């Protein structure tokens, strides 16, 4: 299950204006005031007006801590604040306006003293301003650690967070390997004032910082024009992949999405010297191809068409069909739905050997996998027209979708010998049975292949080493996680081959892998390839993240990102292949959340700072590079300007202890937070296994809008089961999803409910995908005692309905853990009745979390007469819910529903009563 769209699902599509009423007026909408009592209704609004009138008449005065004071009445606002408070009638009684009886000389003395004080104040103010000690609020830099927000009056809007207003500008660099050995080359596509596709030396971006002795590679054009013609038609490149020798470019046009990562396209081979294109498949320019990949030797392209693998030789200008059994149920070289979604997170299951002599590819047989129908009522994803007379019927797409406990696709790794034009399979003794085998990673290691495979519930791992030329193989590592911590093995795609180089001290081939060590994920170096006892490169009570990032083979340095400073930060580190000299690359003296991408030769890198301050990006030389270089490529000045001008929420980070376990939280407070007021609180969470929602990234998202725009407190707590707090706290959830995740949200809510500034009667929780499941599970487990409201988008409601590879990793199979599946499902629906109200939303065409989940729960609710909920469904929308403006409706619905909840409207609905009949007076005739 991918991270929930609800975490950052903002659409790039233009949206209409969102009207935010200025007052809590029944006729215009109901924006909640954070200062209200636990049930805010219209009568209380009138009470507030009367209390303000009473205050004005002197019955009581509004002090700085008055809970009835509006947020915009803040005395600290430099433009509108009251520097000198007026006197009330009570004060006037104590200090009459007349000065009867005051000595004239004393009056003169007081006037002189007052004049001197005022003069001194004016001089001091002039000095303060002239020496730039004073800055208007709009000029003060954004401080993520601030506990007080300077008042500028500008509020964050839903339009902004739904659009791109608060999105940091971010650039990616397509680093490419030079055929001439130069490092730091990048691919520039459609750059301003440049040819369409250009190879440049990264140092040309700022040649002023380059040592004169360093040769900067000259730019070279690969594709000059933005369009190309073929057969009388004009085509525009969608995606491009240069060959390794940079003499040709593989181009994809007319891209059409399939699933989350996969797509169909027309492919072309573009000649750089001639500046002309030809179809990848000679004579068939319009054929839809699923995948195309260059050979590392630049003389051939492997591609998949109709689930069969082909080889286009450019040297001999011919096409060879490698497989012939592909079709609706057999995939060659590309993954099926579940492998694309849960294993490879991509559209390729084809791997070239570095010498171009072999192709490894996955053969997937879905024959035994049951189908699930996805209905489209308004669109036709197939692109076909309905038969005459069938226009009124929905299009149905049948997906081979293995649910928990059902038959999995059968996968086998096969090899193709290019020179012999021969496919073959290498038999490995002791392998998992067909229905109990997952192949999760394939890495070429010289003439050998490292293959990772697990059983279907992911608690036994085998690392197999295949000698392709000899057509033999054996398991070199076999681990049972039950003997380690009772959890599961994560799927990774970062295993790195380290070739032997005696001149560099590497006597034999090896590889770097992520392993379980010290209750965390750490890096290990296995050498030779068949060694099962590694050199540990990292250790300690912290984790490496999706590592290694890269390896500098010239200097035997491994670069990686880790949580060494804090579980909610990310810094870049380096360590020698010996496991010595671990040190930070980024500044660990300041909080930071970094990621990094390296050039092909590891001499340069794009370093991206994501928070907590305004994000920036720069190209740097790596520590081992003798030629130092640094160039800022993005400072996000416009974002920084907006952060100065707008009143962003106050973010408070910390930890809470639940059952002795420290859990990270972030609390977003309204900009003019007053601890003496009573605030409603919204808990937002995802809670999925290994995920993390609390981090130090700079974000202004929907949760920020809830705090800064609506005036509520918004809290996120990463409970047990989430990532980066140790495997012990992660794997505790195995076999019973939802038990601990819900428990920890309830425990956190009780902590907040006890705070003086929280209205314990107005607590809500929401989430999307796994977060939607945990929202419902929390309401079920809590039974209305803590959380009064919940909002669940695209929720799983029974793990028997979700895909096997994801679900069984955490739940085992229904056949072996039936009780766990029963208790993890949303079954105790009478407990949901104890909350005030909850909301569910789902996309009808969700191919990931099927609509079946919500429909089944609705039936359970009907069976026991539960009615305190609302439902909204979105035709033709998938898991992201975007079709026909749906994403905007999701967030409008969340917002308005939440406002009604915190304004007490759902309490009225729960006890709906008709008004008394008014007597009807007879109309008398006019005489």
Swiss-Prot record:
GO terms for cellular component: plasma membrane; vacuolar membrane. Its EC number is 3.4.14.5. One of its GO terms (biological process) is proteolysis. The active site is at residues 769, 846, 879. The keyword Transcription regulation does not apply. It is a single-pass type II membrane protein. Glycans are attached at residues 365, 530, 828. It is an enzyme of class 3 (hydrolase). The keyword Glycosyltransferase does not apply. InterPro entries: AB_hydrolase_fold, Peptidase_S9_cat, Peptidase_S9B_N, Serine_Prot_S9B/DPPIV. Residues 1-44, 58-101 are annotated as: Disordered. Belongs to the peptidase S9B family. This is Probable dipeptidyl-aminopeptidase B.
């Amino acid at each position: 299950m991918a991270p929930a769209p609800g975490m950052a699902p903002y659409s790039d599509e233009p949206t209409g204006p969102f009207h935010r009423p200025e007052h809590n007026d029944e006729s215009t909408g109901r924006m909640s005031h954070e200062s209200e009592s636990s049930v805010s209704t219209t009568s209380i609004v009138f009470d507030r007006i009367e209390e303000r009138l009473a205050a004005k008449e002197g019955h009581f005065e509004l002090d700085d801590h008055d809970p009835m004071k509006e947020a915009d009445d803040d005395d600290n606002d430099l433009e509108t604040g009251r520097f000198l408070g007026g006197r009330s009638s009570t004060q006037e009684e104590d200090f009459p306006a007349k000065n009867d009886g005051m000595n004239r000389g004393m009056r003169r003395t007081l006037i002189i003293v007052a004049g001197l004080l005022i003069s001194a104040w004016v001089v001091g103010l002039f000095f303060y301003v002239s020496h730039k000690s004073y800055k208007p609020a709009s000029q003060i830099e954004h401080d993520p650690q601030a506990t007080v927000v300077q008042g500028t009056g500008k509020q964050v809007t839903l339009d902004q967070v739904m659009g791109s207003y608060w999105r940091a500008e971010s650039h990616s660099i397509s680093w490419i390997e030079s055929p001439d050995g130069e490092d730091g080359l990048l691919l520039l596509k459609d750059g301003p004032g440049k040819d369409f596709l250009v190879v440049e030396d990264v140092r040309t971006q700022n040649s002023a910082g380059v040592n004169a002795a360093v040769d900067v590679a000259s730019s070279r054009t690969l594709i000059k024009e933005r369009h190309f013609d073929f057969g009388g038609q004009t085509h525009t490149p969608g995606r491009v992949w240069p060959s390794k020798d940079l003499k040709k470019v593989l181009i994809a046009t007319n891209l059409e999405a399939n699933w989350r990562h996969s797509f169909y396209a027309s492919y072309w081979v573009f000649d750089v010297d001639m500046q002309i294109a030809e179809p990848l498949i000679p004579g068939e320019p319009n054929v839809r191809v699923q995948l195309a990949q260059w050979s590392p030797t630049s003389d051939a392209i492997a591609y998949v068409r109709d689930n069969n693998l082909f080889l286009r030789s450019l040297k001999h200008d011919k096409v060879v069909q490698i497989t012939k059994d592909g079709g609706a149920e057999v995939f060659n070289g590309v993954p099926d739905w579940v492998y694309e979604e849960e294993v490879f997170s991509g559209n390729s299951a084809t791997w070239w050997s570095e010498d171009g002599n072999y192709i490894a590819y996955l053969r997937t047989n879905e024959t035994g996998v049951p189908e699930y129908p996805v209905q489209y009522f308004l669109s036709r994803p197939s692109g076909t027209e309905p038969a005459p007379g069938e226009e009124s019927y929905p299009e149905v797409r049948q997906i081979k979708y293995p649910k928990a406990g059902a038959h999995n696709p059968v996968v086998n790794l096969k090899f193709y010998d290019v020179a012999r034009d021969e496919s073959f399979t290498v038999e490995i003794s002791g392998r998992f049975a067909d229905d109990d085998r997952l192949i999760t990673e394939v890495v070429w290691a010289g003439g050998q292949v490292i293959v990772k495979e697990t059983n279907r519930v992911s608690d036994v791992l085998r690392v197999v080493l295949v000698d392709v030329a000899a057509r033999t193989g054996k398991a070199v590592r076999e681990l049972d996680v039950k003997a380690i911590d009772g959890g599961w093995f994560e799927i990774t795609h970062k295993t790195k081959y380290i070739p032997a180089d005696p001149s560099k001290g590497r006597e034999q081939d090896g590889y770097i892998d992520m392993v379980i060590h010290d209750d965390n994920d750490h890096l290990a170096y296995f050498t030779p390839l068949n060694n099962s006892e590694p050199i540990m490169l990292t250790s300690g009570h912290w984790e490496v993240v999706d590592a290694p990032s890269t390896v500098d083979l010239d200097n035997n340095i491994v670069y990686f990102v880790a949580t060494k400073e804090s579980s909610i930060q990310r810094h870049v580190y380096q360590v020698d292949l010996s496991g010595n000299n671990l040190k930070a690359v980024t500044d660990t003296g300041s909080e930071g959340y970094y990621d990094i991408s390296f050039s092909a030769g590891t001499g340069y890198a794009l370093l991206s700072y994501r928070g907590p301050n305004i994000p920036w990006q720069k190209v740097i030389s790596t520590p081992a590079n003798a030629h130092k270089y640094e160039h800022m490529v993005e400072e996000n000045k416009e974002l920084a300007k907006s952060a100065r001008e707008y009143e962003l929420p106050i973010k408070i980070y910390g930890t809470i202890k639940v059952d002795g376990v420290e859990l990270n939280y972030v609390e977003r407070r309204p900009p003019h937070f007053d601890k003496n007021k009573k605030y409603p609180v919204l808990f937002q969470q995802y809670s999925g296994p290994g995920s993390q929602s609390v981090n130090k990234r700079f974000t202004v998202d929907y949760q920020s809008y809830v705090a800064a725009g609506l005036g509520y407190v918004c809290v996120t707590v990463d409970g047990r089961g989430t990532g980066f707090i140790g495997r012990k706290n992660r794997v505790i959830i195995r076999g019973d999803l939802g038990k601990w995740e819900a428990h920890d949200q309830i425990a956190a809510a009780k902590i907040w409910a006890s705070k003086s500034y929280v209205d314990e009667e107005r607590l809500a929780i929401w989430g999307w995908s796994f977060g939607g499941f945990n929202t419902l599970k929390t309401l079920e487990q809590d039974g209305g005692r803590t959380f009064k409201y919940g909002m669940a988008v695209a929720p799983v409601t029974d793990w028997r309905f979700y895909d096997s590879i994801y679900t069984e990793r955490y739940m085992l199979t229904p056949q072996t853990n039936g009780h766990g599946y029963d208790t993890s499902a949303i079954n105790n629906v009478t407990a949901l009745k104890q909350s005030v109200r909850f909301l569910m939303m789902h996309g009808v065409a969700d191919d990931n979390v099927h609509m079946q989940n919500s429909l089944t729960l609705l039936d359970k609710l009907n069976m026991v007469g539960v009615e305190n909920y609302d439902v909204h469904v979105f035709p033709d929308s998938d898991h992201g819910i975007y079709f026909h403006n749906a994403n905007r409706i999701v967030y409008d619905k969340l917002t308005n529903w939440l406002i009604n909840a915190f304004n007490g409207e759902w309490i009225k609905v729960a006890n709906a009563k008709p008004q008394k009949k008014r007597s009807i007076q007879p109309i008398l005739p006019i005489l």
